[in-house]
């Protein structure tokens, strides 16, 4: 006979994306809600891009997976490892944390140096340690991990993020990588710190230990910056002079947390004037998200959404289908809810 059948049709498909009310200058972008795990906006999300220092998120992942004691494991810096940087073609891409030959730091301290300042020395020191004396061996671990966690268009060529045409990713893969990193103990605390001072300074190299500190490169998190954004945290910045400025940041307001992935915003506008479009884009997307989205019931559990034919039945030859529970999604207030089809 006829009856009501609960259906889970609505929760499974969250593939609604929306159009922001601002121009996004970055080559590729994703706006993602951490609470509902919805992608709310994407631009060229599957187009390959060079990630720059965003690579260091994967460097951190491999270290965290291979180091059981971040505070008890120390490494003494050897400039043999990073002498090659001195002859690098694009010196503007190099980032240093003032780590000198003979400095002994904990793995956690090297991770802070790398995540906050994009330190190339810290990246190479960590990669050498956890690649068992081989940077190439470490890069293999980076690529193996990317494949294991579901990246489909990412290849790593070095642990620093410096320019290499083989080094490619997508905004969608960077979302996968960042979410995986955030699931690991210790990552978020390090990547969202606003500053860090190492405690084991070598006095010969750093006579004024208190002056040796690292500040978060994401100026959206710094209260004295004109780009300060209330609720923003970390996670990673990355510039390459040949490709542009990139940033991944998260922000929380009113218990809603968004993650923004932005790859390769141009350095200049059409008139050749220096711009910080990656920060403009992040601000635009977050403002739009916090202003425009609300939890909305797309479908109530009492709503009948379809009639399904039943073969060989007594009496009525169909059942009425309705959702098991109310279907609630994050929805853009300016988009008419009646535009949603239930089938």
Language model segments and positions:
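Domain-terminus/edge residues, biased toward the C-terminal soluble/receptor-binding domains
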Residues: 151-152, 165-343
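Short, basic/aromatic-rich helical patch in the C-terminal catalytic core of site-specific tyrosine
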Residues: 1, 59, 268
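Positively charged, low-complexity/disordered segments
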Residues: 2-6
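Active-site-adjacent loops and short helices of periplasmic peptidoglycan-processing enzymes
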Residues: 7-8, 12-172, 178-185
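Conserved beta-strand and immediately adjacent loop positions that scaffold enzyme active sites
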Residues: 1, 28-30, 247-248, 259
